[in-house]
From Swiss-Prot:
Domain-level remarks: The N-terminal domain (1-265) is necessary for binding to KU80.
Pfam families: Ku, Ku_C, Ku_N, SAP
Annotated EC: 3.6.4.12
Span list, region Disordered: 1-22
Keywords linked to the UniProt accession: ATP-binding, DNA damage, DNA recombination, DNA repair, DNA-binding, Helicase, Hydrolase, Nucleotide-binding, Nucleus
Every Ku domain range: 270-470
Entry protein name: ATP-dependent DNA helicase 2 subunit KU70
Residues annotated as domain SAP: 588-622
GO molecular function, a single term: ATP binding
NCBIfam families per UniProt: ku70
Knockout or disruption consequences: Severe developmental defects in both vegetative and reproductive organs resulting in sterile flowers. Hypersensitivity to methylmethane sulfonate (MMS). Longer telomeres.
Keyword ATP-binding among UniProt keywords: yes
Membership in a protein family: Belongs to the ku70 family.
Amino acid sequence: MDLDPEGLFRDDSDEDDDNVQEREANKEMVVYLIDASPKMFTPATKADEKEETHFHTIVNCITHALKTQIIGRSYDEVAICFFNTKEKKNLQELAGVYVYNVTEREPLDRPDARLIKEFSCIEDSFMSNIGSRYGITSGSRENTLYNALWVAQALLRKGSVKTVSKRIVIFTNEDDPFGGLTGAVKTDMIRTTIQRARDAQDLGLSIELLPLSRPDEEFNMSLFYADLIGLEGDEIVDYLPSSGEKLEDMTNQLKKRMMKKRKVKTLAFAITNDVCIEVNTYALIRSTTPGAITWLDSISNLPLKAERSFICNDTGALIQDPQKRFQVYNDKIVKFSTRELSDVKRVSSHHLRLLGFKPLDYLKDYHNLRPSTFIYPSDEQIFGSTRVFVALHSSMRRLGRFALAFYGNPTRPQLVALIAQEEVTSAGGQIEPPGIHMIYLPYSDDVRYPEEVHLTSDDAPRATDEQIKKASNLLRRIDLKNFSVCQFSNPALQRHYGILEALALGEDEMPDVKDETLPDEEGLARPVVVKAVEEFKASVYGENYDQEEAEAAAAKAGASKKRKALTDAAAEKSAAHNWAELADTGKLKDMTVVDLKSYLSAHGLPVSGKKEALVSRILTHLGK
């Protein structure tokens, strides 16, 4: 078998392994627990003319989350579970709990088109197939909320909490599920339910609540659910949706809260040789691209798995042993094992190592190579990381400095700048969280200096004071107030995914995608804006400026300039030959068509026709 000397230090396999590891670390399993009691089927708001219910709101939110998940988080797994139902469907045979699913799919699995399509229409058949009832009533020891938590925990048994994030999300508008009970029965059922939730949390499961307030009263977290999910003090307020009369506002709030911000990876941050803390990294705003193409089997329609095999050059047989790599040194072949190669390519024992501090004004705009990464501390593995992180963050903010660090990524080690960000809050909540931005810095050979362009004062036109004044007035008239890049979706991507969604769900009509990047014609048609535009045009081009005439004149001048350039080039090329001598000796027929046309172009003669016609035209012009 042949060894691989040139690919000794290639990172192909390492890069693939990193992608798999990062994907597994980002994988999430979610169980949606939906309250199906009769209260969920009452009108959601007082001013609701369509009589839409909280149940309808939840179905819309989960459907939207599933569609988004297929696009951006296709490896996540989801289960949908109703509690307070007449029918039961779960492996534990517990009453009042119904695990919803479709054929050819596991209860906890990646979402598919059939699940989304059938779940979005579940309201039509819910009462007849599943049914709604009050699960916790006086005179009964049945506890459907306890049963639902038990079933959800059982669904989330697969996968390790070290590599998979597991969540239980509860949707309900009942803030006191045990309000109809009294005495020791109520106390005992509350205690066992809270204990069941804490047992699940001890196993690494996260329990979240998305409460919905009824028209007649706000959702009161302190009655029960604050103890269930472990909230205290000001944390309770963050869980309450802001009050609003429109169901659309409530739906938008739920959609935002269902999409949890997830870490990209966990890094070890070495402050000194003896002090190391743990931090999580989060991706910020960056360009979105269409999903990668997945090759499918033509018969089963299942994704294909790519496999790579090595073949011996001598025998043509498959090589079963792992590939070996070597380096020729002093006319000797030095073989490397996989572990030795890994040690050679490891440039740092820590993911992130602090080098020192510099003033913030040393950092320039062009030092930012690509979108930054946000860093936040974690005490999950290294206790006390948050305390050290806060001390470092506060000192950097107070002294106006940034930290210079070495990011020991195996495939591309880089110098990074760590810039502390202060928390920004408003009456509506937190706008920007406290933390540190990791800016990727260039090496010296990455910096490109622009070429100097020498211009005289006559080369570049200068605006007059009147033109600057009119331009400033125009900018004030069309100012975009409260602008944010988050308000605009990429129309090409929206149409791309809209078509895929329509095809997957079997919809007859393609979605109508609104292009929010187009100019606001209604806003630009306002009289004050039109007046500002006309005044600016008049100050630059004059009162009697006609755009069509100007464009026609510019096109004519451009064409004339182009013709002159072609004629000059042809004249220069034809001057290299003695055409009179060529005509006398009969060698014109030996010239190429390009050379013949250069003579004709230089003298303003037609260049059409075959070679014989071109030669005849030249002879006529020469008077031969």
